[in-house]
């Protein structure tokens, strides 16, 4: 075994000197297992990041370096961090190193373990088939539909509902889809992960889900690598079992943020806004592995925090380039009480074309967007001069646009405990029919509030009857 000693500790970054000139390779895992003087045991894993010369390597710790001292002996494992894969991971909760952190005991020693670093699938192995993934959420299915085996980003600032939307998608898709899911909690709140675990346990979805967490309280090394741990588990189900896997990542921005912290500690020159100079490379290495091959598919749904609601920030801007569909959450809509607060004009999908979704769906979606865009243009006139100054045609546009805007809202199953109202799953056909009839003017006589937070168009009619009674 190749052994070295700790020569310098800078928070989560540790320098290790190896004698004899045999240095561990980049990405190799190094371990420390010993007790210090006051009797507390230290069990640490580092990942090699740089070769500094003078037989010294600079490493990043995967857990807190409290209690570590210079001179501590370190062992080279000779391979990268490896995590359990396969059916043994289902129903379990892991940390970045693949150690079980639930109450169901250790993972058996004979379970296969795969390294978290690997190449993306070769060009000729990739699949190009396009199939729509129904979510049951009206605004998504109509205006920015998701692709099976595609990459989807949920963009939004703090507190606009990204995690709630991810939880609803887990509820709707994982239960309907019935396949295997992997959830990676990257640098988010431990409470949310705990809530999600208990919700999934209650609904039974946990039996087909592997969960990996490296939350806000973890050092940056763990937050940076935990997405790769989850991805490695998902890749095994895709490549070895030919499964269609769902991969949820909450939050991909924290992956970038952790990379930025590590980069500064490793002594790299910062780039724009203080981010790491390797931002695009790191994001590309992760995203290119999340793909569909001839064997199976990985459909990934990633929450992306937008710092200070600024979409030009390098972190969200770099993520945009990799996605097939984007769902943009807007603070202005939360203030209007429209949930999910998805911006129907800013959200995009490459699947919204007549060849993929069909002519009728495409036409209805485009008409909805045109109506909302015209309403947006008229808002300045309304604010200055009032509704009375509009032409009859524009008054009708505003009238219908407000109904469309409210009808894009919906009650969620995961929010039942807050709203006291049952969540709704709306099939795509129902969604298209409902919006088509609103555009045709069938419901011009119904009150606006009847359209708020409902499922299908039948619920609107019921609400209107109650209001008019």
Swiss-Prot record:
Membrane topology: Peripheral membrane protein
InterPro entries (alphabetical): AAA+_ATPase (IPR003593), ATP-synt_VA_C (IPR055190), ATP_synth_F1_bsu (IPR005722), ATPase_a/bsu_AS (IPR020003), ATPase_alpha/beta_chains (IPR050053), ATPase_F1/V1/A1_a/bsu_N (IPR004100), ATPase_F1/V1/A1_a/bsu_N_sf (IPR036121), ATPase_F1/V1/A1_a/bsu_nucl-bd (IPR000194)
Superkingdom, taxonomy of origin: Bacteria
Coarse class of the protein's main subcellular location: membrane
Record bears the keyword Transmembrane helix: no
Membrane-spanning parts: none
Gene3D superfamilies: 2.40.10.170, Bovine Mitochondrial F1-atpase, Atp Synthase Beta Chain, Chain D, domain 3, P-loop containing nucleotide triphosphate hydrolases
Catalysed reactions listed for this entry: ATP + H2O + 4 H(+)(in) = ADP + phosphate + 5 H(+)(out)
CDD domains from the UniProt entry: ATP-synt_F1_beta_C, ATP-synt_F1_beta_N, F1-ATPase_beta_CD
Keywords annotated in UniProt: ATP synthesis, ATP-binding, Cell membrane, CF(1), Hydrogen ion transport, Ion transport, Membrane, Nucleotide-binding, Translocase, Transport
Top-level EC class: translocase
Residues at which ATP binds: 156-163
EC number, UniProt record: 7.1.2.2
Single GO cellular component term: proton-transporting ATP synthase complex
Pfam family, one: ATP-synt_VA_C
Compartments where found: Cell membrane
Molecular function, one GO term: ATP binding
Family, as annotated: Belongs to the ATPase alpha/beta chains family.
Subunit details: F-type ATPases have 2 components, CF(1) - the catalytic core - and CF(0) - the membrane proton channel. CF(1) has five subunits: alpha(3), beta(3), gamma(1), delta(1), epsilon(1). CF(0) has three main subunits: a(1), b(2) and c(9-12). The alpha and beta chains form an alternating ring which encloses part of the gamma chain. CF(1) is attached to CF(0) by a central stalk formed by the gamma and epsilon chains, while a peripheral stalk is formed by the delta and b chains.
Function: Produces ATP from ADP in the presence of a proton gradient across the membrane. The catalytic sites are hosted primarily by the beta subunits.
Protein name: ATP synthase subunit beta
Species assigned in the record: Bacillus anthracis
